[in-house]
Swiss-Prot record:
The record marks 159-160 as: Cleavage. Its main location: mitochondrion. It comes from the Eukaryota. It comes from Trypanosoma brucei brucei. Belongs to the ATPase alpha/beta chains family. This is ATP synthase subunit alpha, mitochondrial. Mitochondrial membrane ATP synthase (F(1)F(o) ATP synthase) produces ATP from ADP in the presence of a proton gradient across the membrane which is generated by electron transport complexes of the respiratory chain. F-type ATPases consist of two structural domains, F(1) - containing the extramembraneous catalytic core, and F(o) - containing the membrane proton channel, linked together by a central stalk and a peripheral stalk. During catalysis, ATP synthesis in the catalytic domain of F(1) is coupled via a rotary mechanism of the central stalk subunits to proton translocation.
Length: 584
């Protein structure tokens, strides 16, 4: 064994990114320097590595091993090394232990170089990956290797000296705390009707090209605005896990996050369609491991899994290659456990455990709006609610295309603050009556009752291309709820909101009192006081401001819009309204 160690060590300086996490997990303390942990890990690795057999056969990304006589054995879910050359190794994960002694291995690295007859060494270590602040702002793969932005090859550099075990259990009941603090997405329809709390698991489900990824990425971007208003130690950390996506999609999302300054708080984990099925299977667990590092230190983390349908397909592929018995839709019998042990790791910890949280936003793709499919029903039963995106609403121009009737949040108003709760409570009743009246009047004359008038304007306010500020959403919905938009035509509702929430334009609407309002409306504490009985003066000023704004809007804008007749003016108006819709 010493002879093997000296022979292998000479060529492994560039390959220690994988060996170090595996071996140093049990010995390296948190926060140890990279140099010291690397050297000690190499020594520990070669002392504990033992040859256990040879590669017998290879089937895709699965290798079958024949144990050598007198081998010390190998444990399930541990890492093995296959010697593909005198100085190069391929990594694998023990995934099947058969009665005849054969061992099924998921290959994760250097797959094309693995051949029958090559020696296999056991490390005796579970998979560990780098975690901590060092992974923020980077694109990594499930093994913790940084991926260049071009996504052509992956480097072997160890990102951080702190390591986290990928396969861990979920926090127990005693360690958890009730979900009672909101995580704002920036979309009015979600934050009012389907609120998400920190520590919750909210499924995003819908057909292809209905905006599922858009909602998840926009939620990450919205956290940047919130992080800028709070202390850095309370900033929300985001982990975006891409499973089975095209490399171009991952690069596009990376550029989008970079343009909004979100990479400072975000890690992108990429297990693209070009990666082995084993890495696509491991990606969500590696992502939540990075999130748990921050949760255990009292921080708040958002994990997006895009999407779990492709992880289930990768797991099915692995199981079939390992000759495991297929079940419904050829998935193995433990596919439910595949997702439950992942999503149960999302939690809000109790104050005694630091008070940190991991919020999970899994994405699942449906086929022809079928929410009764196997994987879809499994994940729905695990999560605390779902946001259902409708193809008809999407093709009709609604953004986000949230079907409020089929969407639900089991946390409810307990994850909303006083301001949002005061608006959302009445809003739900109006929208429910609006949907009922709209369904009854299909093909006939619609009776213009208050629920019909305000419901149509609420739907217009819910249509937004990008996240909006929390305080702007509250004021807009409050104006609609109290009848200030009743006389505003539906096609001009977004223009009304645009002028209302922009300070530079809003100041043009009148008095010094309005100017004062726009100065302090940006303060969250003031906004919450609008909807309490503790500050009737501020509440009255808000009412007066909305009254003046509506009067001047109807007088100076809507009347002029109705008088427009020339094609040039109509085109200019359409461009103006389109730009306003995109802005809010």
């Amino acid at each position: 064994m010493r002879r093997f160690g000296s022979k292998f060590a000479s060529g492994l300086a560039s390959r220690c990114a994988l060996a170090c996490p595996l071996a140093s997990a049990a010995t390296a303390p948190a926060g140890a320097s990279t140099t010291s942990s690397t050297s000690s890990a190499q020594k520990s690795f070669f002392k504990t590595t033992e040859m256990i057999g040879y590669v017998h056969s290879i089937d895709g990304t699965i290798a079958t091993l024949i144990p050598a006589p007198g081998n010390p054995g190998v444990a399930y879910n541990t890492i093995i090394q296959i010697q593909v050359s005198p100085t190069t190794f391929a990594a694998g994960l023990v995934f099947n232990l058969e009665k005849d002694g054969r061992i099924g291995i998921i290959l994760m690295d250097n797959i094309t170089e693995v051949q029958s007859g090559q020696k296999v060494m056991a490390t005796g270590q579970l998979l560990h990956i780098p975690v901590g602040a060092g992974v923020l702002g980077k694109v990594v793969n499930p093994l913790g290797h940084e991926v260049p932005v071009g996504l052509v090859t992956r480097s072997r550099r160890l990102l951080d000296s702190t390591l986290g075990k990928v396969d861990t259990g979920a926090p127990n009941i005693v360690s958890r705390s009730p979900v009672n603090y909101n995580l704002l997405t920036g979309f009015k329809a979600v934050d009012t009707m389907i609120p998400i709390g920190r520590g919750q698991r909210e499924l995003i489900v819908g057909d292809r090209q209905t905006g599922k990824t858009s909602i998840a990425v926009s939620t990450i971007i919205n956290q940047v605005r919130i992080n800028q208003q709070i202390l850095s130690k309370n900033a929300v950390i985001s982990i975006y896990v891409s499973i089975g996506q095209r490399c171009s999609n991952v690069a596009r999302i990376h550029r989008l996050l970079q343009s909004y300054g979100a990479l400072r708080y975000t890690t992108v984990m990429a297990a693209t369609a070009a990666e082995p099925a084993g890495l696509q299977y491991l990606a969500p667990y590696a992502g939540v491991t990075m999130g748990e590092y921050f949760m255990n230190r009292g921080r708040h983390c958002l994990c997006v899994y895009d999407d779990l349908s492709k992880q289930a397909v990768a797991y099915r592929q692995i199981s079939l290659l390992l000759r495991r018995p297929p079940g419904r839709e050829a998935y193995p019998g433990d596919v439910f456990y595949l997702h439950s042990r992942l999503l149960e790791r999302a939690a809000m910890l109790s104050p005694g455990k630091g008070g940190g949280s991991v919020t999970a936003l899994p994405i699942v793709e449906t086929l022809s709006n079928d929410v009764t499919a196997y994987i879809v029903t499994n994940v729905i039963s695990i999560t605390d609610g779902q946001i259902y995106l409708d193809t008809k609403l999407f093709t009709g121009g609604q953004r986000p295309a949230v079907n409020i009737g089929l969407s639900v949040s089991r946390v409810g108003s307990s994850a909303q603050n006083a301001a949002m709760k005061g608006v959302a409570g009445k809003l739900k009743g109006i929208l429910a009556e609006y949907r009922k009246l709209a369904a009854d009047s299909v093909g006939g004359q619609q009776v213009q009752t208050i629920p019909m008038i305000r419901g149509a304007r609420f739907v217009a306010l819910f249509n937004q291309k990008q996240p909006s500020y929390f305080m702007n959403a509250i004021v807009s919905l409050y104006a609609c709820l109290n009848g200030y938009l009743d006389d505003v035509k539906v096609q001009y509702v977004k223009f009304y909101e645009y002028l209302l929430v922009h300070r530079d334009l809003g100041i043009m609407y009148g008095t010094a009192k309005n100017k004062f309002f726009y100065m302090y409306v940006q303060e969250l504490n003031y906004l919450i006081r609008f909807f309490t009985l503790n500050s009737p003066i501020l509440h009255g000023e808000l009412e007066e401001m909305l009254k003046q704004h509506t009067h001047l809007f109807l007088q100076h804008y809507q009347s002029k819009m109705n008088a427009i007749k020339s094609e040039k003016d109509v085109k200019a108006l359409k461009n103006l309204l389109y730009s306003c819709k995109r802005a809010v």
